[in-house]
Regions:
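Soluble, non-transmembrane domains of envelope/secretory-pathway proteins that act on or interact
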Residues: 1-86
Length: 86
């Protein structure tokens, strides 16, 4: 599959930033897809999150620990990555 995650890379260890009010921040994940018109369905730890068209970038707020991120296009092609939130 030619599609790939721009961020996060496989097995990345990520520290979420703190917001100005001290609350937990977000991670922004991004996918490069070979078809610019594709619809992407995003899943974090096998739970559907959202879908994107045109710009394949979303923000997530996962709990500390290991996570699996999977993107599925409208044709059923999938690409996955694993990352760790510290």
């Amino acid at each position: 599959i030619r599609d790939r995650f721009i961020y996060p890379p496989m097995n990345a260890h990520i520290k979420l930033p703190k917001q100005l009010d001290g609350s937990k921040g977000f991670i922004t994940v991004e996918l490069a897809h070979s078809n610019p018109n594709a619809t992407i369905f995003w899943h974090l730890d096998d739970t559907y999150q959202t879908q994107t068209q045109d710009f394949h970038k979303i923000s997530l707020q996962p709990a500390p620990g290991k996570h699996s991120l999977t993107a599925v296009d409208g044709e059923g092609n999938t690409v996955s990555t694993t990352f760790f939130i510290e």
